[in-house]
A protein has these predicted regions:
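N-terminal secretory/targeting leader peptides
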Residues: 2-128, 138, 143-362
Length: 362
């Protein structure tokens, strides 16, 4: 274990012990008072931001309310305590007990983590939840994070995203060449191989980068969040579908020592709070996106466009190569890929005669 990880873990342990000691007074009937805990939670999102930001905060507030204050959580938005992309490190070191973000932000540390946010042309929200909760995905996720002293939980999903905002038309595959676009995860590598330049930026920097021309295009989430950022004021063309993020799962991560210090009832509360947010957030997006899309349709400065078929076909083909290469160089990714696609193949067959068939008939 690295020295900073050891010291960070000791900091978490010291906080837990000190808090438990303070609460060890006896209750009125002579029995020990329940232990209480004081945690800090960092996120990758702007403060009070619709959907992801509010959803992340709801995990903390639900835990505190359901525990009757036995777990108090101080919540920090992205950049307030640690940079937006350093949530994983802060929790892994034990600097804080808890974090909320997206697993594909950690690809430089653990490539296979990208499976637990989104794979281009992969699972949607419903399928991700089925795989994680019932198909063995969550067990693989926890196995992957164990060396980092982290316990992950699914804690939100935006639903299928939009393809992004562009300051140039995409009429063919050739139009992707030289395109400088904010796009993370495997989607970014796919764009690079298609001739573009992927850029990773936290949400708070996207508008300025797009408005000033530092980037030519950006994906963010969908109408609900994109209007909140004013992206419709920074670019003209709004493309769909979101091939790169069909059902991105967000994560809540807890430092292992902090997790193991909790009694069984508080562990259940943490798990259920994450699950509650995982259910509510997609509903928030389905509602918010429907309303925001109407606003965008009324905005004459915005053109809503579908990616050409040849562009989608090329991106899908590249995705297969990227995923295969990831598995070839990373045994953990190979195990996860096998489980992921085994379930996706079964689910896709079912979707074609259920959800997909219904939507085509509606």
């Amino acid at each position: 274990m690295k020295r900073r990880q050891f010291l960070g873990g000791m900091a978490v342990a010291a906080g837990v012990v000190a808090c438990a000691k303070q609460e060890a007074d006896c209750s009125g009937d002579g029995s020990p008072a329940p232990q209480s805990f004081s945690w800090s939670m960092v996120t990758s999102w702007p403060p009070k931001f619709p959907g992801i930001g509010v959803g992340a905060e709801s995990v903390g507030t639900r835990i505190e309310a359901a525990s009757g204050g036995r777990i108090k959580i101080k919540i920090y938005a992205g950049g307030e305590l640690v940079p937006a992309f350093e949530v994983f490190d802060a929790v892994s070191r034990g600097t804080v007990e808890m974090g909320h973000g997206a697993a594909y932000y950690h690809k430089g540390k653990v490539d296979a983590a990208q499976y637990f946010t989104a794979i281009p042309f992969g699972m949607n929200n419903l399928e991700m939840n089925a795989w994680l909760y019932k198909g063995g995905g969550l067990e693989l996720w926890r196995e992957l994070y164990e060396p980092f002293d982290l316990v992950p939980f699914p804690a939100g999903n935006t639903g299928t995203q939009m393809g992004g905002w562009f300051n140039k038309e995409i009429n063919s595959v050739d139009d992707l060449k030289g395109l400088k676009m904010r796009i993370p995860g495997i989607g970014g590598e796919v764009l690079r191989r298609a001739g573009g330049t992927p850029v990773t930026l936290p949400g708070s920097e996207i508008f300025t980068a797009l408005q000033t021309g530092a980037i030519d295009a950006t994906e963010w989430i969908g109408p609900y969040n994109d209007i909140a950022f004013g992206l419709n004021k920074a670019a003209k063309y709004y493309y769909y579908p979101g091939w790169h993020e069909p059902g991105p799962t967000l994560e809540c991560i807890v430092h292992r020592q902090a997790w193991e210090s909790l009694p069984a009832d508080l562990k259940a509360i943490v798990e259920l709070a994450c699950m509650s947010t995982n259910v509510e957030m997609p509903a928030d997006y389905a509602h918010g996106n429907a309303i925001a899309l109407e606003q965008l349709k009324a905005d004459t400065s915005v053109e809503l466009r579908k990616f050409p078929d040849d562009v989608i076909d090329r991106l899908r083909s590249i995705t297969r190569d990227v995923v295969a290469e990831l598995s070839a160089r990373d045994p953990a990714a190979a195990r996860i890929e096998k489980s992921y696609y085994a379930f996706l193949d079964k689910s896709a067959a079912n979707q074609r005669i259920s959800e997909q068939a219904y939507l085509e008939a509606r």
